[in-house]
Amino acid sequence: MTYRSIMLSSAALLTLPSPAFSQAASAPSPAPATNAQPSASGSAVQPIDDTGDEDEIVITGARARGSVIGDIPPENTLDARDVRATGATNITELLDALAPQIGSSRGRGGEAPVLLLDGLRISGFRELRDIPTEAIQRVEILPEEVALKYGYRADQKVVNIVLRQRFRSTTAQVAAGAATDGGYATGNADLTRFLVQRRGRTTFNLHASGNSMLTENERDILLDPATVVGTPEQDLAARSLVGRNVDVRGSATINRTVFGNVSGTVNTELEHSEGRSLIGLNPSLLEPLDRTTNANSAHLGGVLNGTTKSQWRWTVTSNADLDVNRTRSDRDDPDFPTDHTRSTTASADLKATANGKIFKLPAGDASTTLTAEASTVHLDSSRTRLGASSSSSLSRTMGVAAINLDLPISRKNRGFSALGNLTLNANAEVDQLSDFGTLTTIGAGANFSPLDRMNFLTSWTREEGPPTINQLGDPILDTPNSRIFDFTTGETVLVNAITGGNPNLQSDIRNVIKFGANWQPFEKTDLRLRADFVHQVIERPISNITVTEQIESAFPERFVRDSSGQLVRVDLRPVNFDSSRRDQLRLGFDFSKPLKSRRPSQAVIDQLRQQFGFGGRPGGQGGTPGATPPSGSPPAVQGAPPAAGQVAQGGATPSGPPREGGRGGGGGFGGFGGGRGGGGGGFFGGNNANRGRLQFSLTDTITFVDKVRITPAGSELDYLHGDAAGSLGGTPRHQVQAQGGWSNNGLGARIGANWRSATDVNTLTGDTLHFSPVGTFDLRLFANPGDIPEIALKHPWLRGTQFRLELTNAFNARPHVHSALGDPLYSYQPGLLDPVGRTIMISFRKLFLPSPATIRRLFLQDRPQGAPTR
C-alpha cells in the first residue's frame, strides 16, 4: 500500500463516525499488502466498521497486551463495544455504570476499586479519570485477591483498563439539569485533551461544576410546632436541604518512556470549591444562620514502571497532597456572631513494588510481590467558638514492608492434572506507625479452577488498622438547630450537633474470610455467574454515634438533656465499639450479546468514496475481488499459514512471537491496519455484522448477620432486627443493583435500578418505625449521530458528537417511614431523606478529531526509521 493511499484513508476517517478514527489511531503501522483478502461474498464493498473496535488477536498460549499479573482470571471482561454501549464518556462515568460489578464486601466500607492501566500501577485515580472511553481497548474486572500482586490489600476489587495503542482527541462537554419538583439546578462543563501513542500519553483537563441551593420551603416539609422559632414560612426558608456548591479544577498527566524500557508518569492537579448552606433561623434577629465552606487542594503524583532483564516487573509511585479547608458558621449570639474552623492537611508517600519469579515447582513458577512504603501526613486544625480559640496538630509517619507469595500446586497440562489448576497464596505486612506502633496483617488463600471457565477463590485475612488522621484530628464543628430523632423519647428534636475528630480512637483488628466463585457456563455465550460470601469480625470497630438508648447508656457524656429530659446537645464524633460481625452473600450475573447492525446502503458508501476521491475499489489494494494483491503475492487464505516473511494475523511471523497488541494485517481503505481479524478492514471493509450490544448485570447483596457489641459488658445492637444503623433505619436484608443497556446503529439506552428491602426500628417508648422498601430507576438515552453514515455524510459537523438525556430516580421514589402508633415523624419525612428526587439532565459532547495533516505528521513520527514515505 502506498503512503498516498494511507493519507487518502486518513481523509476518510474525518468524514466517517468519530469512533472510526480510533481504529486508525490505535492500530499498528501498515502491514504488508499480502494480507489483503477479497470479500468472501465476492462483493466489491463490505460494510463500514464505524466503531473502530479491532479485537486483539491473541496467539494461543500468549498473554494479551496489558494483562494483569498472575493466573486469576477476570470476573468479567468488556471489549471496546461493550464499553461504548454503556453510554459513558469518560472513565468516571464508566465506573459508575459498572458499580454493581466492582463493589466489594471485604473492606470496612466505601473502598474504591484498585485501578490499573495496561496491567500496571498508577499514582492515583486522577491519572485516568478524564480519559475518553473511545480510547479504551478493553476493561477487566478482577477479584480482590489480585490486589495483593500489586502491593495493595485484598479489600477492594481490581479494574484493569487497557488503552488503544494510538488515539488522539480533544473533547468538550456541557451538561445542565434540574429537579422536576423544582428548586434545584445543576450543571457541569469539561474540556479534555488526550493523546496516546508509542512514546506515551498526555491528558489535560479543565472541569467546572455547580448546583443551586434547595431549601425546606421548596419541598413539602412539615414542622413540629414545638420547634418553630419564627413563623413556619421563615423557619422553612432558613434551612437548606442541599447547599449551593461550585467546584473548579485543572489537571494534567504526562507519560513518557524516560530511558530503556522504563516509563515515567507525572500527574498534577489544582482544585477549588466553595459552598453555602443555611442551618436554621436566628431566634433573635429572625434571619437565616449561614454556613460557608472554602476548600483548596493541590496534588502532585508520579510513577516509574519498568522490567528487569530477569523479567521482574517493578513500580515506584509517589504522591504529595496539600488540602486547606475553611468553614464559617453564623451563631445566634450577638456578642460572638460567627464561629470559624480551619484545617490544613499535608501528606506525601513513596511506594515501591516488585513482582517476579523466584523458583520453579512441578506445576510452574512460584512468584512473589515485594512492597516497601514510606509516608507522612500532618494535620493542623484550629477553631474559634464564642470568641475562644483552640488549635491542635497531629502528625503520622509510617513505614510499610509487605510480601505476597503465589505457589502453583497443579496445572491441567502438568502433574496432578486431575486437580485442575490450583494456586496457593500467602501474604504478610508490617506497618510501623509513629502514633500507633507496630501493626500487622497476615493472610492466605487459594485459587482453584477445576474446569475451563470455572473458578473458585477462598481467602483469610487478619488485619490491624489505625484510624485515619482525619478521624483523629478533624476540627470540631458545632451545628445548631440540627433535626434529630431521639429513639429514647420517640420525638424529633432540634439539638446542637457536634462533629469532628476524636483523638482517643484506637486501632481495630479485622478478621475476614471469603469464599468466591465465578462461572461462565457456555463457551459461546457471554454469561457469567458470580458469588461471594464474606464473614467479617472486627474488634474495636470505629463507628459514628447514633441517638439510641443503648448508645446513650454506654456513652452518657456524649448526650446532654435539659431538666424535662429533652435532648439539647449530642456529640456525634466517632468512637470505638467493642466488636462487630457481618455476614454477607453477593450473588450476581453479567450478560452481553452482540447485535446485528444495519448495513449502510451502497449509494452512501459510493458518495463517501467519491467525495474524497477514492479511485480504487474497497476490500483490497484498490483491486477487484479475487485479483492478485500487489507485489505478485498470492491472496491470503483464511486459516492458511503465511508465506515466508509475511506478517501473520495478530502480527506474528511464523517463527516469532506476536507483536504487542497485534491485530489483523493492513487491508482496504483502513490503511493503518486491518479490521477485525485481518483482511478487508478499514472503513469500506471488515466485519460489520455485530456492532451493537445488549447488556444486563444484576447483583443482590444478602445480609445474614449485622451486629455490634457496644462495650464488653454492654448490650448488642442488631441492625437487621430492630436497631437503627443510620438515617434509613436498620440494615436491609436485600440490596439489589441492576444495570441494563442496548446500543446499536448510533443509538443507545441504559437503565439502572437500585432496591433495598424494608427494615424496622424499635424505640424505647414501645413504638416501631417501619422503613418501607424503596427502589429507584435511572434512565440514560444517548445518540451518536456521527455513527450513522447517512447523517455523517450530510452533516460532517456531527462527527464525534453525542446527545444525551438522563433521568435520575425516574419515578421520583422516596423512602417512607411510618410509626406503628401513628405519631408524626418530622425527621423522617420523604423530602428530608431524599430532598432532590427526580432530576432530568441534558448533555452535549463533541469529540474533535485531528486533521489529515496531523495524521500524516503522527504517522511520520511513528514509522520505523528508514521506511519510505511513499
Model-derived segments and their meaning:
Residues 385-482, 498-522, 534:
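Structural signature of Gram-negative outer-membrane beta-barrels, strongest in the C-terminal barrel
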Residues 611-684, 704, 752-761, 783-870:
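C-terminal beta-signal and adjacent terminal beta-strands/loops
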Residues 38, 42-50, 57-108, 122-131, ...:
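N-terminal plug
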